[in-house]
Amino acid sequence: NYFKKKLPKKSVMVGDLNIAPYEEDVWDHKKLLKIVSHTPEEIEALNDVKSSANWVDITRKDIPSGLLYSWWSYRARDWDTANKGRRLDHIWATEDIAEYGFGSHILRDVRGWDKPSDHAPVFASFDL
């Protein structure tokens, strides 16, 4: 596994992983179980990667509960009102620095800009 063999200490991985692993990372867990980005197979694969190097999901460490999304479909013109999102963008850190991560937030308002991405920026700070 690449993430385990070549992983330096004090690592942070960020990106659009296109998988929403938790029930509160999608607008309707049961409806999305057969939809790409929230299938049991994808969640299991992502969890395997996460556990292979003991990655810590910094966003969920900081915001452990509640609905949390970083993506809303372009097909939904009323994306803000409908709020049918998914948390597809992640910030993970190795255990040795995870405790220093704080202040995670998603800039939801950016999704409402003229000609926006369907993803909103995800932030976390680290006091190293």
Task: List each language-model region with its residue ranges.
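Metal-dependent phosphoester-hydrolase catalytic domains
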Residues: 22-128
